[in-house]
Design a protein with these regions (language model features):
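Outer-membrane beta-barrel proteins
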Residues: 20-26, 37, 69-73, 85, ...
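Outer-membrane beta-barrel pore domains and translocons
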Residues: 1, 41, 50-56, 86, ...
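Residues that define the transmembrane beta-barrel architecture of outer-membrane proteins
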Residues: 28-32, 41, 75-79, 126-130, ...
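Gram-negative outer-membrane beta-barrel transporters
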Residues: 41-44, 149-151, 175-220
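Signature of Gram-negative outer-membrane beta-barrel scaffolds
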Residues: 1-90, 112, 216
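Residues on the lipid-exposed face of transmembrane beta-strands in outer-membrane beta-barrel proteins
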Residues: 34-40, 83-87, 132-136, 188-192, ...
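Repeated loop/turn-to-beta-strand initiation elements of outer-membrane beta-barrel proteins
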Residues: 44-47, 92-95, 140-143, 196-200
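Surface-exposed extracellular loop regions of Gram-negative outer-membrane beta-barrel proteins
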Residues: 55-62, 73, 86-131, 142, ...
Length: 220
């Protein structure tokens, strides 16, 4: 295989079987997490809850660089709390509600970029979610209706731009912060057992998913 992409070698670089070409990177992901959950039932009431925490750390090493330096990110901690309750009004109708707060550590690409650039202050993505609804069930019919509201905050995004400025000379990495989204909507689903061998299912969803607030970016 002859590679003519490197301008420092106008006659090309010859690679044979077993040679390493294009890139030679090592990456690691160290993850540690704990969680606990519980459930409570009393008569028509059923409730559950869970609590969890985790910590993650990344490393990146590009063996094609002169320094061959191993780059390690700081440990990033996150937590999650979820809970819900369901109450049987009667044998056919039940109502329910769920709440949750979840932190999601950024993926490696949003902490250490492919060129070795490290984000200065990577933030956890955060999800605040609630859902309320009801179920209706009979021998032949089943209907579920629910309303949800999810706020997705500090979504992590990276953008590569060519500017002719910055330490790289022509290409810079922008770590975007404050990218927030709002997801709200109403969902309906159900089924009808017309005869023993025929069941009809239906589903509908109406939602508003949109970006909110202004985002900002940091050159690295």
């Amino acid at each position: 295989y002859m590679n003519y992409a490197n301008k420092n070698f106008p006659n090309g670089v010859k690679s044979e079987l077993g040679d390493i070409i294009a890139y030679h990177n090592d990456t690691t992901v160290d993850w540690l997490g704990f969680y606990g959950q519980g459930n409570y039932t009393s008569g028509a009431l059923n409730a559950y809850g869970m609590l969890g925490t985790s910590s993650i750390k990344y490393s990146y090493q590009d063996h094609f660089t002169v320094a061959n330096e191993k780059i390690t990110s700081p440990s990033i901690s996150a937590m999650q709390v979820k809970g819900g309750v369901m109450y049987d009004v009667n044998e056919n109708i039940s109502v329910f509600g769920n709440l949750g707060l979840v932190e999601k550590p950024p993926i490696m690409d949003n902490v250490i970029y492919f060129d070795g650039t490290v984000a200065s202050d990577p933030a956890n993505e955060k999800f605040q979610s609630m859902e309320f609804g009801m179920n209706y069930n009979t021998a032949k019919y089943a209907v579920k209706a629910s309303y949800y509201n999810t706020q997705w905050m500090d979504r992590n995004l990276t953008k590569s731009v060519t500017t002719g400025q910055g330490s790289s000379g022509d290409t810079d990495v922008i770590f975007l912060t404050g990218v927030d989204q709002s997801h709200t909507g109403f969902e309906l689903e159900g089924s009808a057992q017309v005869i023993d061998m025929l069941r009809l299912d239906f589903a509908a969803s109406f939602g508003t998913w949109q970006f909110v607030d202004d985002a900002s970016g940091n050159y690295q």
